[in-house]
Structures are given as C-alpha cells and as structure tokens.
Amino acid sequence: MPYAATPCLVFAGQAKQAIVYYENVFAMTRRRIIMDEAGDTVYHAHLSNGAFELMLWDESAAPNTSSSLHLLLTFTSLEELEQVYLRLTTDGQIVTPLAVADFGGWYAQVRDPFGILFALSFSEEGRESEALLERE
C-alpha cells in the first residue's frame, strides 16, 4: 500500500515568516491557514505546490527537536533543482554545494534560515556520474 509523507514543521513563533519563505522558495500556495485572533500565532498551515506539501505551525512551548532531520526533495529536472537551490541559498547556509555526487546524480544540502536542512537531488536514469559531469 503506497503512503504519502507530509513534513510537519513546528516553530516557536516563526511560522508566519516560514510560510512566506516556503511560498517563495518552493512556489507553494496556501491551501489552509488557521491563526489566532490577533494573527500572531499559526495554529495550522498547509502549503502545496503540486509536487509536495508542507504543514507547519507554532507551538506555545519550545518545540521538540530531533537529533537530525533532513528533507530530501527529488527533482524531475536539473533546471528545477537549480532554481530551488538558488532561492534556498539566498538566505540559507550551503552545507554541501550543488555538484555531481560520488553516488551518482546531482546533489546539494542547504540549511534554511529556520534550521531545516533540505537535501536536493536529481538523477538522470541510466547515466553515470562521469556522463553528468559533461553537462557542466
């Protein structure tokens, strides 16, 4: 049985800023947002761009953090990966620069301003790393 996984990101008062950031970086649209009466706290937000979805909200107490969380996004074209990489690196920190990885295919890691690490990947079927290097 296939399952879809939707990342749920929890913030300590930064969810409003994260919504705007992810809308711009990933060309996402707001499917649903529930906020407090003052408009300061996000109780629930659901963003989508047709390829993947994000849910996010603010927690009143400091959110629990995992020891390590990476969100791997697999792209259908190198151009699409490069566009998202450029938008992420505008305000984010490059952890692994975009390059052909030893394991084949294009790969990068960027930590966004909210501390979320995005791993970006693209691979052409049947192509080895050496063949991908010819595209540079």
PLM regions with names:
Residues 2-3, 33-35, 43-48, 59, ...:
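Vicinal oxygen chelate
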Residues 2-6, 66-70:
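Short, solvent-exposed beta-strand edge segments and adjacent coil->beta transition regions
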Residues 54-56:
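Contiguous beta-strand/loop segments that form the cofactor/metal-binding neighborhood of enzyme cores
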Residues 15, 73, 107:
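Solvent-exposed, flexible loop/coil residues
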Residues 23, 62-65:
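A short alpha-helix capping/helix-coil boundary motif
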Residues 8-52:
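Core segments of cupin and vicinal oxygen chelate
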Residues 10, 72-74:
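Short hydrophobic/aromatic beta-strand micro-patches
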Residues 13, 66-68, 108:
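Glycine-centered flexibility motif
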